Curated annotation (Swiss-Prot):
It catalyses: GTP + H2O = GDP + phosphate + H(+). This is Translation factor guf1, mitochondrial. Its EC number is 3.6.5.-. It comes from Schizosaccharomyces pombe (strain 972 / ATCC 24843). PROSITE patterns: G_TR_1, G_TR_2. Belongs to the TRAFAC class translation factor GTPase superfamily. Classic translation factor GTPase family. LepA subfamily. The gene is guf1. The lineage of its organism: Eukaryota, Fungi, Dikarya, Ascomycota, Taphrinomycotina.
Amino acid sequence: MSIFRLSRTFSLETCLKSSSFKIRWRFFSVSYASRKLASEDNKPSIQEVVRGIPQNRVRNWAVIAHIDHGKSTLSDCILKLTGVINEHNFRNQFLDKLEVERRRGITVKAQTCSMIYYYHGQSYLLNLIDTPGHVDFRAEVMHSLAACEGCILLVDASQGIQAQTLSNFYMAFSQNLVIIPVLNKVDLPTADVDRTLIQVQQTFDIPMSKPILVSSKTGKNVEQILPEIIQKIPPPKGSENAPLRCLLIDSWYNSYQGVIGLVRIMEGFIKKGGKVMSVNTGRKYEVQQVGIMYPDMTEVSRLRAGQVGYIIWNMKNIDEAIVGDTYSTIGSNVEALPGFSIPQSMVYVGAFPLDGSDYERLNDNIEQLALNDRAINVQKENSSALGMGWRLGFLGTLHLSVFIDRLKDEYGKELLITSPTVPYRIKYKNGREEVISNPNLFPTNHQGISELLEPTVDATIITPSEYLGDVIKLCESCRGLQKDCTYMSESRCMIKYQLPLAHLVEDFFGRLKGTTSGFATLDYEESDYVPADLVRLSIFMSGKSVDALCSIVHRSLALQRGREWIQRLKPLVPKQLYEVILQAVIDNRVVARESISALRKNVTAKCYGGDVTRKQKLLNKQKEGKKRLKSVGNVSIDKSVFYEFLTKKQSN
């Protein structure tokens, strides 16, 4: 009995103590939560923080590197480090907003993000621009660097300096930007930090006594980058009290808000309700909203000199947003800023809807994509075989491929794309010159022509030295002209060739990767037009030219290509009621021929016997009918045949 009372007493006391502890803990929790909420209420908003940062604590900088050297991964680390993104909203390649970018693992569009960084007790506004690494998107890099005072040059410690590393360095150097080299992927077993440091110092003449060695994958030493940016990259120039001058560096279209512009404020300020005008065109707009990318569109009260942000300005016509244009306050007499040179298209294709009824809608979709990528050249054209379509110009084959993917991802549309061609120049004896980007306009009769010229590129190839001989053979087979060959180290060399652009379009990069087991890198820039022996290769069906299959080739390749195309096309063309003749024609001369037999119909099936002349009469009647049909009829070819043929040819 006593044991029972003791246990009851102990249990009661324990419960009372526990209840008292719980009451006290709950009171403490409520009190702590109240203080925490109060502190959060007192915490200034991002708009207030940005408004309080003076111009001398603003830094505009970009990340440039060769493709796949870790630019986007490094940007992710820096955004997490500064608190712009956290574990809840984080995803890999955070700034890569396009589906094609995340699927392919490459950056296509330069993306901007602002961040707040506290250094030595002061807040800094850091505007980061993540740039593409592929040569086809060089224009994006150029536009991005125009908005910066400095950049991070990222180099893969396992691969060293690559072709696009050189190109991006000289692009930044030509704009007098502060360049901070950073070695990435130092945690890899294949990383050779010492060798890469020597390469950077010797190639770029940059002292590497205190190198920044990071791993964007693990986050190692990434925190060392931001203090370097603050200390070495100067703040932007320009007075907030001066008349407004802002540079349009990018634009995109929103169905509800119209054209949205990304601008760098060079002088003055801009705010909601302001009236601005284009210095070049004189068109006027009312500003509906201004803000920064943090990381998404975040409205602020005003954008001041030195800042990078977006403007919603009631612009409905997508043709009015000209990248590189200068905007100022209405009534201000200011000088236009140096704009951007429009990049010249290097690859042209014919594009046609698979369904003719989609033409108008596709036209709107293509114009909206062209607004977001001014390097795309769009012209309408008509094909007798494929109907209404467009002649599209791109900076390269990857640029073309990304455009096709974006059209499918963002609008659910597909196009029938003809063979890529390059712009050729024709000089006539009377002094006139003409540039031809459509093969159907290339003359078959060379009378009156003094010279035919094709575009070339200056290609820079960096390859392991053991593949040097194979690379030279590949370039020579593409009619290349060697310009230089230097050894960067005992194991790597850099070779420069002048190559016909037409060969570069025809999967030269893929062949280069196959020749060097994927170790070679390629960069190129536009070079001169040189004389070439060019001919037009036409495909005829039953005596009529098929304009969708026309191309311009060098005479040395024309015969082989004509035979290949005819043999590949033959099994795809459906049989007709009469024989169909396929011909490859060069300079009005047939160089390859195939025939597709007619559909057979047994017209004598009902004749079971009797005079043989009855059967002969029916056969002759059928023969005359086929002859008459052949003389007046057209070969009916569905678009799916062209789609299959062109798709196979491009994949090969």
